[in-house]
């Protein structure tokens, strides 16, 4: 017998007991104390032999063992589709009926079969549906981070999906819950963000009123682009994260910055602390540079930045995306 996704639930449950299983399975021939000493909890109720911390794949295996009919959705789907910075979030699954499980985001509701695909042997939502779900359910401005990563154009001119494809999905699903939220996210999304903090930098600058700064702005006379740039005023804004700390990257950056400033551009570097608690000073610096180059617009306003609940400087590295704090059993559909 196969379930609606074409999987054999019996085959899914046939796993070597000495690798992973429910506690009752691991007890065969062993005491409860021995099981606790010789195995490690992967998710509540499922353990694997050995003392090593469970990997992401271990957690996926355990969830599939517990729920043979699951579909990986949201950030879990994004990870399977190769989205950078998607790891670090709680596992997120869809089930045909409501359940609650500690540490797992569980969604339910209508999920059309055509929105379900297999990736790396896992059952997950399609690329477009995964992007739509992040736009509906991710926390705060991580909605925009997620969609940015799905539509980001790489050096070969490729992206996983596009804004028109996502809008097309909404057009063919007119009663989809949260569709207006998806459209709002798309309005602020961009194909030019290479990391979450580049997204946050753009949101702060654009929401302040300086929306003429272009993501991945080419610098004439050089082979380079800048994270955000105004070609008219020759002002560039560059996010300076941990990636730029290595000696080799600093050497590359200095040569690049020299080439850009040789074209009479100025470069303003921004860091995560500035975006989190120094937005007023950062935007004032940008405005002063613009005015020195002939800009006569109104002073920028300091906008909100809706970061995920646990995204704090003392707990999350500045180049990482934060895990989201969500209630289990959120309605899906």
Predicted feature residues:
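Surface segments flanking catalytic/ligand-binding clefts of nucleic-acid enzymes
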Residues: 4, 16-20, 24, 155-333
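Short gly/ser-rich loop at a beta-strand->alpha-helix junction or flexible surface loop bordering the NTP-binding
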Residues: 1-178, 291-333
């Amino acid at each position: 017998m196969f379930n609606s996704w074409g999987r054999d639930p019996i085959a899914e449950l046939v796993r070597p007991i000495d690798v992973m299983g429910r506690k009752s399975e691991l007890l065969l021939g062993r005491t409860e104390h021995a099981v606790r000493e010789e195995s490690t909890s992967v998710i509540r109720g499922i353990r694997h032999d050995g003392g090593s911390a469970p990997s992401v794949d271990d957690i996926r295996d355990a969830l599939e063992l517990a729920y043979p009919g699951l579909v990986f959705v949201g950030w879990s789907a994004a990870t399977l589709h190769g989205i950078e910075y998607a790891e670090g979030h709680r596992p997120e699954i869809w089930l045909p009926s409501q359940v609650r499980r500690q540490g797992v985001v569980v969604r339910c509701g209508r999920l059309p079969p055509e929105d379900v695909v297999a990736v790396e042997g896992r059952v997950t939502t399609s690329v477009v549906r995964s992007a739509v779900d992040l736009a509906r359910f991710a926390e705060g401005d991580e909605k925009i981070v997620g969609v940015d990563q799905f539509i980001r154009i790489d050096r070969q001119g490729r992206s996983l999906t596009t804004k028109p494809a996502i809008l097309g999905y909404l057009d063919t699903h007119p009663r989809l819950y949260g569709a207006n939220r998806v459209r709002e996210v798309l309005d602020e999304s961009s194909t030019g963000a290479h990391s979450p903090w580049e997204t946050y930098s753009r949101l702060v600058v654009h929401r302040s009123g300086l929306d003429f700064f272009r993501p991945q702005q080419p610098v004439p006379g050089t082979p380079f682009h800048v994270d955000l740039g105004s070609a008219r005023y020759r002002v560039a804004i560059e996010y300076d994260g941990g990636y730029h700390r290595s000696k080799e990257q600093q050497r590359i950056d200095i040569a690049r910055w020299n080439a850009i400033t040789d074209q009479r551009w100025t470069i303003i570097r921004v860091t995560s602390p500035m975006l989190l608690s120094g937005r007023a000073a950062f935007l004032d610096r940008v405005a002063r540079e613009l005015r020195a180059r002939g800009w006569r617009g109104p002073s920028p306003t300091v906008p909100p930045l809706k970061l995920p609940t646990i995204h704090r400087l003392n707990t999350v590295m500045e180049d990482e995306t934060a895990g989201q704090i969500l209630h289990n059993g959120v309605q899906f559909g």
